[in-house]
Amino acid sequence: MINLHPAQSEIYKHLFVEQKLRYAVVCCARGWGKSYMAAVCAVTAVFELLELAAKVPNKTVYIIAPTYDQVKDIYFPLIAYDLGMEDYAIKMSRDLGRFWFANNVELRLLSYESVERMRGKGSYFVVWDEISSCTKGIGAEDAWMSVIQPTIATRWSNKRALAYGARSPGRSLVISTPKG
C-alpha cells in the first residue's frame, strides 16, 4: 500500500492526477520522504507506460542521483521490494540499475556522472534526485538544458503523447534537499 503524507500527495496530484505540472521542482528537508515520493512517481509513470502498445518507442523512466552507489543503494530496494515492482518486472538487475517490464517499458537508475548517456534518447518521466549534490561532469543547468529536458520534450511532446495514446506528455520531478 502506498501512503503519501499531505505535502507529497499534493505534488503527486499535480503531476499524475490533475496533470497541472510537467516539470516539478521540490526542495524539502531531510526526513521529508523525498526518495519514497520520487520512487512512487517513477513507478506510477511505469504503470502509465505499461498501458501503451509495445511498438510505442521511448518508454523509459529514469531516476538520476549524484552517484551510482546512491541511486542503486537507495532506489533499487525501494522500487523492487518496498513498492513491489519485483512482481511486475520481467527482469531486473541491481548491478545494472535496470528494471525491464512488458511492452518494452524500462526503468533505469543512472548516476549524474553518467547523465550524458541519456543524450539522444527519449524519456517519459525523469526523477532527478539531490540536484544540489550533482557537481561532477557538466554543470546542472547544462545537463538540464542540453541533455535531460530534451529527452523528455522531444520524444514525449504533447503531439507525440496524443499520437501514442499516452495519459500525458513527458514529465519530470527534480527533488532535493538544500545544500548546506
Residues of each region from the PLM?
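Short, flexible loop motifs at catalytic/binding sites
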Residues: 1-180
